[in-house]
Amino acid sequence: MLFRSSAHAELPSELTLRWSRRIGAGDDKRHQIAAAPVAQDGQIYTIDSHSMVTALDETGTILWQRELGKSTDALKDASGGGLAVHGTQLFVTTGFGTVVALDTSSGAWLWTQDLASYGGASPTVYENLLYIAARDGAAWAIDTSNGRIKWQVAGPTVAASHTGGPGPAVSDKYAVFPFGSGDVLASFRKGGLRSWNSGLSGARLRLASTQVRDLTGQPVIEGSSVYLASSVGRMAAVDLNTGLRIWTAKHGSQGHILLAGRAVFAVSDTSNLIRLSKDDGTLIWSTPLPKFTKKSLKLRAKIHAHFGPILAGERLILASSDGLIRQFNPSDGTLLSTVELPAGAASAPIVVNGTLYVLNTRGDLLAFR
């Protein structure tokens, strides 16, 4: 079976590292790279762990850089950030609670909006509005031309959430906002009037990580349904117009979910690459992934992060913090091949014009062809 979807991209079966370019600061004890690169018209945009934005061309040449950090004190305490590109504007959210619009060709500062809220979640652009769900439980629609707030809605209070965070999903009628509490809110996208809200409750017993009940991936809208996943063992399909549950599966997600054909793919919260039926949430297959960074039972405090999956070249691709790109058969989950990374992955990969780009924990953008 061939998998074709809007997420599908062409990519050679054999991947070789073509170039590597330092784009700023990598991960450290206080800061993490929290956003995948974005691309448009032959340019790739990144944000490092200290809110440095970089634009590069497809040869790895740095075109411009812009430091968005407010101050030394802000950089000490804030991490995360998100990117979205549309037309001649690059939109950036920061961990300091600001949203910035930059000119894509020069990096010139166009406008800034201070949301006075914990930011860092990825923004979503639809027509002339920028939609943001802050990590502390608020949501905004911002005019892309001048940065003015068009409307705002208050979401649930959030005690704890993951760094960065997913962006809203937007259709012609609705904006669907994910929050760190595990709740989702749908508003009419033009005026902000609430339509419905829902939550993904769940638990993984004896796991401290389940104290953070975050929606870990961007909601995915397809037709009249929206697909959601949490960090605590729940995935669901919901009617976009009513918020009523279509199905629920006892599988969470570490990050974004991927829809392709009649399938839903994700890296589960228990570190398995899984495929579910999009129709009813039935588990089709599950492939175990490396989980703990230490083999000793006493040292199992940290787990490997697996970013993705994406679908390219008719195969599923993950980039992982253990320093490997893994490629899988989407039909049965078989591991097809691995490619070594210089240092662990820090973001989901993207594919542009037959090249795979991924950030590593050192702050390097890597290009594979």
Regions found by a protein language model. Give the residues of each.
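Short loop/turn segments that connect beta-strands within beta-propeller blades
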Residues: D57-T61, D103-G107, D143-G147, F188-G192, ...
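Loop/turn-rich, solvent-exposed surfaces of beta-rich toroidal or solenoidal domains
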Residues: A263-K278, T282, S286-Q327
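Blade-level signature of beta-propeller repeat domains, shared across WD40, Kelch, NHL, RCC1
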Residues: L341-R369
